[in-house]
């Protein structure tokens, strides 16, 4: 509807140019917004203010000129146009025009809300990317929900999306993992003086050790690893432990309905020589220096607050060097747009990774890649914070939440706040089967509509299709509000996708569910006469479709019974 209003304004301005009423002959950007107050109409346009300088006229005079040239016609969508204040053009849409939105929803079905805004442009989204050193924690879970939903939103907006998981399967943390598993294999427990200083203490380490000693075989992605069973073969333990925990993380993500197109391994950057090649190019480009036996990168040349060590005096690389190599590989794979969804604790790495990429002189834009950073999650039960999982040892796992409150509630709750806002996950609320639980509130609206359809069927009343639905009878404030909300769904999707803000979908669905509950509490659907019942059933058919489509974008089910 907003696009149709924009087109009417543009056509009116073209007529002004054609007859000389406006002199600039340059079409301005036409912004159509929802007014802050309902009494000002359905849409407002500020184009007259933006044209004032070029036209050398008062905005209100320009607005009056444009309005005179807008041709709506008897069958048009505009029910009224007002000019307010210094030159706001306010539009009121005819009820019958709003009602026709329902026919669009019916025709599009599961595709309603999707657009071609992305024009099939390639976008790579990297998310989760957990170290394979233990079960996924709740921070990974929030990142998985946000990243996965961003992918769904971008796909719905016409982008060609590649989902990628980067395994940090090299470095000090993996060495600590291997030592921890080896210690368990040898019967050494935490607290023993022989236990590794930075060892992992969760019960899952015992599980890995037991499987290793039993010479089990693990399949993880393209890896097929059979345990050697030798507690003294640290390299064999490392390979098995990484594969074992990769498999566990993959199973957790599958339970969370999160899937990836590409899995990349940090270790492959070393075996393929990519890390050494990046270091060679950085040295060759003159952006490095040696000091105290270490190799440094002059990241201050590219906006960092201090220079950074690349290669330590012992010959090992700091973690951001393989990150630079990995992102160069992304660029070389043709991804001119990359979005990294990460925890806020990775904020400090952004500047140095971008600095390394700039120092390569590879033609990579300064602000590439883009980042979405999520804040921490606090889990509450009975008014107290939950901090420990027996299996993980020191943190609450994603699997803990899924097992306790279910996938739907876990995903919805993770998505209810803007990524850069801290999130309190109330387990008690997530388990409630009441309208106080946000995900239950939305799902119940869908289930309630299904029960209405079932009741209609029991009375021999079928849910109609357009044009037999008598939508012209839909005129109560609650009915029109529902239709307006339904009509705004495509815009909500596109806005959420382009801003990387999935929480907008949760807000929208709660608003739509609330509008439905308000409508249902004030209006009878069945028993108000055949034609009005038909119209209201058709309205609810549209509401149910949009609720289902919106929940699908969040990876949440739309049950028909609850």
From Swiss-Prot:
PROSITE patterns associated with the record: AA_TRNA_LIGASE_I
UniProt enzyme class: ligase
Keyword Transport: no
Any matching Pfam family: tRNA-synt_1d
Compartments in which it is found: Cytoplasm
Motif ('HIGH' region): 130-140
Catalytic reactions on record: tRNA(Arg) + L-arginine + ATP = L-arginyl-tRNA(Arg) + AMP + diphosphate
Cellular-component GO terms for this entry: cytoplasm
Enzyme Commission number(s) of this protein: 6.1.1.19
Leader sequence residues: none
A single MF term (Gene Ontology): ATP binding
Keyword Aminoacyl-tRNA synthetase: yes
Entry keyword set: Aminoacyl-tRNA synthetase, ATP-binding, Cytoplasm, Ligase, Nucleotide-binding, Protein biosynthesis
NCBIfam families: argS
Known partners and oligomeric status: Monomer.
Family: Belongs to the class-I aminoacyl-tRNA synthetase family.
Protein name: Arginine--tRNA ligase
UniProt source species: Geobacter metallireducens (strain ATCC 53774 / DSM 7210 / GS-15)
Gene field: argS
